[in-house]
Amino acid sequence: CITYGSQCFREHNDLGFGIIGYEDALRVSSNTFFYQVGYGVGVDEIHKVSRKLGFNSLSGIEISEQENIGLVASSEWAKEGRGWGQPGRTPWVPEDIASMSIGQFVVQVTPIQIARAYAAIANGGYLVTPYLVKKDEENLSDKKLIKIDIDSNNIQLIKSGLRKVVESGTGVSINYGVSNLPPVSGKTGTAEDGEGGLDHAWFVCFTPSEK
């Protein structure tokens, strides 16, 4: 396990995966890999990039008055009281960054936010403003596209890792019993509900993988 603050953070399989790179870390959903990445870049860098991908903000859909902006925490948020405490009494602690790095505890996102972020990875770096339609539409106005300042090599690396998730990783079961399935890229997500509780899980994907 890896210790941050007073807590020991383990791999979800209790054994670890040895030395792996980014793509395989996505494929096997390695917690300890991303603990180290998150701790290395820091909370405020994670917060900054998350804003680029549409988190911590409304999506722009026509029913935005019913949206929740969610939460991707920052050191300033902790310093100001975490939304419930007194300013200066709830500073950022090392345990926060570990949990944040795998999307837990101080991270709360909505389905439409995660869909926008994955769409931006799929389309090469454009954040799309979703809107409601009555029928299929072929054209998308440029006004609904925002180019994100993210290195194209990093986008390709993420796409490759997401494809591996479905080919041989935690999302491989999507292939079972389905014929003529186009290439799918995606990622599992799991949140625990206390000791003994059932996990909450979802799977986010896009297809075809290379278009």
Describe each model-derived feature in a short phrase.
Residues C1-K211:
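Beta-lactam-recognizing serine transpeptidase/beta-lactamase-like catalytic domain environment
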